[in-house]
Amino acid sequence: MKLVQREAEKLALHNAGFLAQKRLARGLRLNYTEAVALIAAQILEFVRDGDRTVTDLMDLGKQLLGRRQVLPAVPHLLETVQVEGTFMDGTKLITVHDPISSDDGNLELALHGSFLPVPSLEKFSSVGVDDFPGEVRFCSGHIVLNLHRRALTLKVVNKADRPIQIGSHYHFIEANPYLVFDRQRAYGMRLNIPAGTAVRFEPGDAKTVTLVSIGGRKVIRGGNGIADGAVNRSQLNEVMEKVIANGFGHEDYPDSSEGIIGDGTHDYSVDHEKYASMYGPTTGDKIRLGDTDLFAEIEKDYAIYGDECIFGGGKVLRDGMGQSAGYPASDCLDTVVTNAVVIDYTGIYKADIGINGGLIVAIGKAGNPDVMDMDGVNEEMIVGVNTEVIAAEGMIVTAGGIDCHVHFICPQLAEEAIASGITTLVGGGTGPAHGTCATTCTPSPSHMKLMLQSTDELPINMGFTGKGNTTKPDGLAEIIKAGAMGLKLHEDWGSTPAAIDNCLSVAEAFDIQVNIHTDTLNESGCVEHTIAAFKDRTIHTYHSEGAGGGHAPDIIKVCGVKNVLPSSTNPTRPFTLNTVDEHLDMLMVCHHLDRNIPEDVAFAESRIRAETIAAEDILHDMGAISIISSDSQAMGRIGEVITRTWQTANKMKRQRGRLPISSSPDAAEDNDNFRIRRYIAKYTINPAIVNGFSDFVGSVEVGKLADLVIWKPSFFGAKPEMVIKGGAIACANMGDPNASIPTPEPVMMRPMFGAFGGAGSANSIAFVSKAAKEAGVAVQYKLGKRVEAVGRVRGLTKLNMKLNDALPKIDVDPETYTVTADGEVLRCQPTPTVPLSRNYFLF
């Protein structure tokens, strides 16, 4: 066959398309992925038929599927489909705009060549939808651009025989010599139009334009070099001599009117919807997160309206305009993420994010201080010739997720994790050994060395926990000094009060965290005895509800204990119709149980309780459970930590209403910001605090590693657009590598340069104990990763958990399993459907 890579990838596209055809033939309405696959694959088949042109196929692609053949969200998710195929005259790009543009498609064309039966259109119901994924609800009012700047009007005539287009931030005095206007008045001025737009002068055109003064230090660079330097009226005669000497069109315009932007005579204003179409939503606008019912309202926008950083042809970030000239690399950003809506536990706001040396060095307004107002452009956020741009207009940026309950059963879990937006993994294991399949322990120093070395080039921060189940300290110091950044107590190794006490004593000496999976059997005691064994010392309780393991039926009581830092694992997130039914077999496999042994079955069944799973939902919403993690391949799904967090938040909004920001219902705002901040903290800052590395990762804050995830709002929580790891793009949606542009199908999450060679280690951290760092494991193991010590975890309490510090008194009825918090029964119904699911995923 001699297949090249692009052919192999197109085969995968064809398989997805054929799968979609089979589902369509059964009368199923297609989701986003299926619709894209079917359209792209069919276009390639029509290319092979050889009797249609590119233009023909661009039109035909819009005829295949209608709104009734796809799920209601799909027309809003699917804007274009692009694919490249081999025509008789070579490889060509076909772009289908608005591919779902009619009520019914042509199903004969959609199934052409498949030999599948064409279903009746009666199989497809018409379901309208008022809400759509990623929708923006705009604030009323208008935004005035370049407010308080000096402004004037000029007449401009194009004397050329070609069109001339001038961008918003081009120094107008430097414009094309064939444009005739009053260049003296234009000194130090630019167009008063939205940033990144332009005015086009056709041959012979005469237009009146409004100019505004440049901002900042008022320094002109670039263009034709006519007025190079600081704007200084005393030098204007010299500048005008250059204008005339170099043949630049100039004509006095005494009819010019002058004023100040804001006085109403020279203003340029846009409404919020128009503004968002160019730069993304701004203060007061609300964004639907994916297809959930959660709305994030932008609380603050650091932009200076009219001076936004926009990259592209004729846009703002060009030499002498938004990009500064004359600044060394040391004064400029390595990378700037522009116009991002940041969703973080610290707030929901819009800003540029500046990255240097892999760290977030500033958040605010980036650009060129020579032409942009100094009260806007942060001195740490200068864009220069050494700066790369990641355009995030209309996008959401979050901190990279942290999964702090990982069974390292297979290395491929790292690929799944980063593709979902997880950038830090904490747990233990050695591969698919039975101990690892059940417990997160990396037991021996040789295992620890193996795991740190084997994950060294992965573009993910790593931390490994040793086994803590022993009643004597012997052996624990060795694994800690070998690199363990924490210890794990697991019932499969014996989580007895004696082992708990000893493990915590050693952890206190080394300032590391202890994670515990308690005793489901109640063999050495019940939950109150385990709590007593803690002796008020800090401990992190895994799957604190109990389905993942722990004292039956009331381990959930620990969520009301001050020194306990509770977390959940994601199979029970949220409580759905099928949650209970899937768990028994999951548990039997993970814990090496035998369904032929009655006691093993009873052990498994005792852990699965609908009542406590339902209560877990509500405790999360109250902020009484602080973390959500995966329990990867050991009763958990590593690629769904983020998705299931937002599914839980959405379920709680639907069942409990808007979350008030205080005890008074009247304090609820007309948005979901508080709930959103509470839930994002569960997989970002709180696991970072619990594990002792919040100085390095866990939030979008200055000084932290630039581990950032970029999302399209319509795909938020389901599928990221790009994952930035330590300032480098490590994973991103990328199309056909042979294509003329990056977007033709098949588009998939692929590793980028930040994940290859030594880049993965250079942009990531290996977290170890202080003792291990001081012992020099970085050198001993020849690690490329930056090695950092965890710390300040002993003495943490629930009150240190951001936005998740509630301490209700929890009781569980041992017979009915009814859970109460401060006397209130915690009860909710399982949901039959969740968002971030069927609209997005193929399987």
Swiss-Prot record:
Alphabetized PROSITE patterns for the sequence: UREASE_1, UREASE_2, UREASE_3
One GO BP: urea catabolic process
GO molecular function terms listed in the Swiss-Prot or TrEMBL record: nickel cation binding; urease activity
GO terms under cellular component: urease complex
SUPFAM superfamilies: Composite domain of metallo-dependent hydrolases (SSF51338), Metallo-dependent hydrolases (SSF51556), Urease, beta-subunit (SSF51278), Urease, gamma-subunit (SSF54111)
UniProt PTM: Carboxylation allows a single lysine to coordinate two nickel ions.
Location of the active site: H591
Pathway: Nitrogen metabolism; urea degradation; CO(2) and NH(3) from urea (urease route): step 1/1
Function, in words: Urea hydrolase involved in nitrogen recycling from ureide, purine, and arginine catabolism.
Protein name as it appears in the record: Urease
Phylogenetic placement of the source organism: Eukaryota, Viridiplantae, Streptophyta, Embryophyta, Tracheophyta
